[in-house]
Amino acid sequence: MDFGALPPEVNSARMYGGAGAADLLAAAAAWNGIAVEVSTAASSVGSVITRLSTEHWMGPASLSMAAAVQPYLVWLTCTAESSALAAAQAMASAAAFETAFALTVPPAEVVANRALLAELTATNILGQNVSAIAATEARYGEMWAQDASAMYGYAAASAVAARLNPLTRPSHITNPAGLAHQAAAVGQAGASAFARQVGLSHLISDVADAVLSFASPVMSAADTGLEAVRQFLNLDVPLFVESAFHGLGGVADFATAAIGNMTLLADAMGTVGGAAPGGGAAAAVAHAVAPAGVGGTALTADLGNASVVGRLSVPASWSTAAPATAAGAALDGTGWAVPEEDGPIAVMPPAPGMVVAANSVGADSGPRYGVKPIVMPKHGLF
């Protein structure tokens, strides 16, 4: 703009009629505050990153993090410097305005000059005001030049103060597509896991099928064998088998009865043989049998202690097995009498199925000739 072409009324009016330097001062303070905050943030972030990467977190990941944050730190530093420069430029503009305002002719003086010129011109009838009119015009010219000079200086200072560093947006310290890549990776991992699970299910199914295929011949053979057994059991053969079983049961019963009889015979033979001289037993053997429902003493065996009955050797216990019947005593209910003996008569101890003479009435009926005969009862098979 050509401020020299404008009269002082315009320039002075513009300078005095504007907003002044208050807005520039407020802008400078705001930019200064931004510069301080951004600078503090840059210092704090840099300190934290340095302490973290050198004291607590070290390694490739730490270096990668520091490298990713470094552009952001540079941006913070540049922004703080630009804000400080803007604040300084705003202050310079305010100072330039103040200078221009001080150099600008007040509009009141310009108006007064113009009023004086008009009065001098009106009263200059005889030319007496020519010098005053010239002085007034000269003063007005000075005002013109002064306002123009002030405006040019202000315009130049404002142009310098308006040169600011362009502000930029911070660069991304992370990959903007990272979330998408993470979601894709998660989906791929899930698909892979599902595929592995399906593959495992197929593998288990194949193994089961293989096992069943291997077991099929064995199962078929087992089924065939079971079917043969079932058919065999459905024939008349089981009748023969049942008859054989019954026959075997009879043989077992016979063997059991024979063993019982042989046991009784062995007991009796052992008793008699133990009393004979030179018996086969080298040590005394005691054997007791208590038949159910029959009174008497137990069956015993001993070596070298036999009693004598006539010409026979009998066990010593026979002499006390049963009380002897008095000599010449008549038996109840009979006409027989017991012959007199030199000593007590020993009798055979009670055996199964036998009755002791002293405990039975009429059991010894009949003639007596020396030793009382021994009667073995007949035992049935078990």
Swiss-Prot record:
One of the protein's GO biological processes: response to host immune response
Keyword list, A-Z: Cell wall, Secreted, Virulence
Keyword flag Nucleotide-binding: no
Keyword Secreted: yes
Application of this enzyme or protein: Expressed and presented to the immune system throughout the different stages of the infection, which makes PPE44 a very promising antigen candidate to be included in tuberculosis subunit vaccines. The immunodominant T-cell epitope p1L (amino acids 1-20) could be useful in the design of anti-tuberculosis vaccines and in the immunological diagnosis of M.tuberculosis infection. The recombinant HspX-PPE44-EsxV fusion protein induces strong immune responses and is a potential tuberculosis vaccine candidate.
InterPro entries reported in the protein's UniProt record: PPE_C, PPE_dom, PPE_sf
Compartments where found: Secreted, Cell wall; Cell surface
GO cellular component, one term: cell surface
Pfam families in the record: PPE, PPE-SVP
Its job: Virulence factor that modulates host innate immune response. Induces the production of the pro-inflammatory cytokines IL-6 and IL-12p40 in macrophages via NF-kappa-B, ERK1/2 and p38 signaling axis. Can enhance M.smegmatis survival within macrophages and under stresses such as H(2)O(2), SDS, diamide exposure and low pH condition. Promotes the death of macrophage by apoptosis in the later stage of infection.
Family: Belongs to the mycobacterial PPE family.
PANTHER family, sorted: GLUTAMINE-RICH PROTEIN 2
Protein name from the UniProt record: PPE family protein PPE44
Source organism per UniProt: Mycobacterium tuberculosis (strain ATCC 25618 / H37Rv)
